[in-house]
Regions:
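Residue-level marker of structural boundaries
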Residues: 27-30, 39, 54, 93
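An amphipathic alpha-helix signature
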Residues: 15-22, 42, 46, 50
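Acyl-donor (CoA/ACP) binding surface of acyl/acetyltransferases
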Residues: 1-20, 24-25, 60, 64-157
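Conserved GNAT-fold acetyl-CoA-binding loop/helix
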Residues: 29-48
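Alpha-helix boundary/interfacial micro-motifs
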Residues: 34, 44-45, 54, 102, ...
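A short helix-loop-beta-strand connector motif used in the catalytic cores of GNAT acetyltransferases and
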Residues: 50-62
Length: 157
């Protein structure tokens, strides 16, 4: 049975997730499709992680399939908008989880912050991400050719 048919749950990121997120962030495929291609040092990650975890305008969620971590969504509220970032663990890719995670995350935005414009940025060649965003209800709203990224808006607003 594929993971897609199994139980997908979410929880807030906690301090003990620091090394998990560090490893996920430095996965070669994650770095390939990130705006910054540089490997993240452990010291950089610790500073970033503590800053995000202690910020009331940041909501970080771990998604689990049958209690095994499968991905993360980070939502950051700023200037009346929420910016979405996400990644899928290498062993969980290609199973249709991303769009399900994104839909669940949008429900969390509504529960956590009521109504906000949600934006997602992706690189033009990241077909898996664009398909997942579109399947989750995001619409392409802008192409920034200077910075080479696509901007998606969540359509259910």
């Amino acid at each position: 049975m594929d993971d897609i048919n199994n139980h997908l749950s979410l929880r807030k990121v906690i301090y003990t997730d620091e090394s998990l997120l560090f490893n996920w962030a430095n996965d070669p495929d994650v770095r390939k499709w990130s705006f910054s291609k540089n490997i993240i040092s452990l010291d950089e990650h610790k500073i970033w992680f503590n800053k995000k975890l202690n910020n009331s305008n940041v909501l970080m969620l771990i998604f689990e399939v049958n209690n095994t971590p499968a991905g993360m969504v980070r939502l950051e509220k700023e200037n009346g908008e929420v910016v979405l970032n996400y990644l899928i663990a290498s062993q969980s890719r290609g199973k249709g989880l991303a769009s399900r995670m994104l839909k669940m995350a949008m429900n969390e935005v509504k529960n956590h912050w009521q109504s906000f414009k949600v934006l997602a940025y992706t690189l033009p060649g990241n077909i898996a991400s664009t398909k997942s965003l579109e399947k989750a209800g995001f619409l392409l709203s802008e192409t920034d050719t200077r910075k080479n990224f696509l901007v998606y808006n969540f359509a259910d607003q």
